């Protein structure tokens, strides 16, 4: 209800537009991301208990070979207490990195989960079939970054990457959860046309 607008900037800053007769802009946090091509600070979402814990989650490209989802605490419009939530997410340091993140309850309302989407990292040669990689996948974690054991490809000690929720995504730049049903809709960017998919557990 604060009417603030959070903005991510590719080059590193997360900014807040503060409401008022004349809106003002302030810096919430500044990363030092890898910014080649489609890399950078990519998305932001808020904890369902934000009013109490003030948690803000941010997806960004940490290096030419790694993306991360981190959590900051909103301390009067300043991000503090950075915590790594999910690390080691794949990137080739170029394109099709995806970068969307969001939080939803499961469709039975039993808990809250963190989702993210990553494209094929510019590799169109079947990385979606590689179940050890999160490239070309939608991932799902608990809010602390741990793996839910009801993820569809969970196999404990491997070889699958247990975070995988769905696969076969070329460049899933953004997604949304449908209010009420919590259905996941992923927007997949193409070369000459775009596609929108309703994505369910284990889809390909």
Q: Which residues fall in each region the model found?
A:
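Acidic, Gly/Ser/Thr-rich repeat motifs that build Ca2+-stabilized beta-propeller blades
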Residues: 1-125, 174-189, 194-196
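Short, surface-exposed polybasic-and-hydrophobic patches located at secondary-structure transitions
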Residues: 3-7, 13, 151-165
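Beta-strand initiation motifs
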Residues: 21-27, 74-83, 145-161, 203-204
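Short, glycine/acidic-rich beta->alpha junctions
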Residues: 36, 93, 157, 164-168
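Beta-propeller blade signature
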Residues: 68-76, 129-144, 198-201
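A structural motif
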Residues: 112-115, 140-149
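Flexible glycine/proline-enriched surface loops and loop-helix/loop-strand junctions
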Residues: 119-124, 155-160, 168-171
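Extracytoplasmic, non-cytosolic globular domains
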Residues: 133-141, 163-192, 197-200
């Amino acid at each position: 209800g604060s009417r603030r607008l959070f903005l991510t900037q590719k080059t590193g800053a997360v900014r807040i537009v503060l409401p008022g007769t004349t809106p003002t802009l302030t810096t919430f946090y500044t990363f030092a991301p890898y910014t080649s091509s489609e890399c950078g600070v990519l998305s932001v979402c808020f904890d369902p208990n934000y009013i109490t814990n003030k948690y803000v989650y941010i997806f960004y490209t940490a290096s030419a070979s790694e993306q991360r989802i981190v959590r900051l605490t909103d301390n009067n419009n300043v991000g503090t207490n950075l915590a790594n939530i999910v690390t080691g997410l794949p990137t080739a340091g170029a394109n099709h990195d995806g970068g969307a993140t969001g939080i939803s309850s499961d469709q039975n309302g039993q808990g809250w989960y963190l989702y993210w989407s990553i494209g094929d990292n510019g590799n169109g040669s079947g990385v979606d079939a590689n179940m050890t990689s999160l490239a070309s996948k939608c991932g799902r974690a608990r809010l602390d970054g741990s793996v839910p054991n009801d993820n569809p490809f969970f196999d404990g000690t491997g070889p699958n990457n247990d975070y995988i929720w769905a696969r076969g995504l070329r460049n899933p730049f953004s997604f949304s959860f449908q209010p009420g049903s919590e259905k996941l809709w992923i927007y997949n960017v193409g070369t000459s046309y775009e596609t929108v998919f309703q994505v369910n557990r284990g889809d390909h």
